[in-house]
Amino acid sequence: MDPRLPAWALVLLGPALVFALGPAPTPEMREKLCGHHFVRALVRVCGGPRWSTEARRPAAGGDREWLQWLERRHLLHGLVANSNLTLGPGLQPLPQTSHHHRHHRAAATNPARYCCLSGCTQQDLLTLCPY
């Protein structure tokens, strides 16, 4: 047997071993999803428009319907969260914060914006599914 054979075998198989033993991509990696990429990822994770309340209705509008649904859902959530509840005697409303803080808080509650800026995992997207 040629003494150089094991050395050549290591040279040829070394990169394959490094690639095979390297870190495997995890399913929980954050991926920045903006616009229609975000909507398509939601469709992929949630299972498509078949869960719509009107099953017979043809799916028209595609991405636009998804975005409208998300805006409506989070608009209603924002209205409930920001509703001015009746305060008891002696309680004062909190002082108004700056426009910057309100804008930042609004961005934090918008899942499409969050996924675009910070990235989302599949688990994050699953929490947005309507079922």
Curated annotation (Swiss-Prot):
Physiological role: Seems to play a role in testicular function. May be a trophic hormone with a role in testicular descent in fetal life. Is a ligand for LGR8 receptor.
Protein name per the record: Insulin-like 3
Organism this protein belongs to: Pan troglodytes (Chimpanzee)
Signal peptide annotation: 1-20
Chief location bin: secreted
Alphabetical list of Pfam families matching this protein: Insulin
Entry's Gene Ontology cellular component terms: extracellular space
GO annotation, biological process: adenylate cyclase-inhibiting G protein-coupled receptor signaling pathway
Alphabetized InterPro entries for the sequence: INSL3/INSL4, Insulin-like, Insulin-like_sf, Insulin_CS
Domain of life: Eukaryota
